Amino acid sequence: MDIDSLMGFDPLLRNLHYILEATDDNTTGNKSNNSGPSRAYVRDARAMAATPADVKECPNSYVFIVDMPGLKSGDIKVQVERDNVLVISGKRNREEEKEGVKYVRMERRMGKFMKKFALPEDANTDKISAICQDGVLTVTVEKLPPPEPKKPKTIQVQVA
């Protein structure tokens, strides 16, 4: 039975499986000195999708904070789909290998990633800004101003 059928596609359970798998390798006599995540974990697209993000609601905006260590702004794309879905995507590439150099340990995740967030109705999709500084992407979506309350309308009564 494969691991996906046991755990579904829950990233937390899948990551736990990889950690336990690495631990099993160390306790079964495998002398690979593998105390970190396996190469399969590093390359797993679902692991990339598990990129941590915080979402804050401020009085005038929504702020999305996503860890993007090692990425340049050109590697990151921020888009709005279907008028209310914020999409943050990108690709993290591994450095080109130099002749005679090999990885002894590989833990940083490589590959494509994508995070989607459903925006609330009061999000102004025409006023979105994004900045990546020190490996942290901050996307700010301004809120639409609250609708003005309807004023009472006076109807003139005519006498017949």
Curated annotation (Swiss-Prot):
SUPFAM superfamilies with a match to the protein in the record: HSP20-like chaperones
Compartments reported by the entry: Cytoplasm
Stretches assigned to the sHSP domain: 44-160
Keyword Ubl conjugation: no
Main localization category: cytoplasm
Keywords: Cytoplasm, Stress response
Entry-linked InterPro entries: A-crystallin/Hsp20_dom (IPR002068), HSP20-like_chaperone (IPR008978), Small_HSP (IPR031107)
Any GO CC annotation of this UniProt entry: cytoplasm
The family this protein is said to belong to: Belongs to the small heat shock protein (HSP20) family.
The protein's name: 17.9 kDa class II heat shock protein
Natural source organism: Helianthus annuus (Common sunflower)
Lineage: Eukaryota, Viridiplantae, Streptophyta, Embryophyta, Tracheophyta
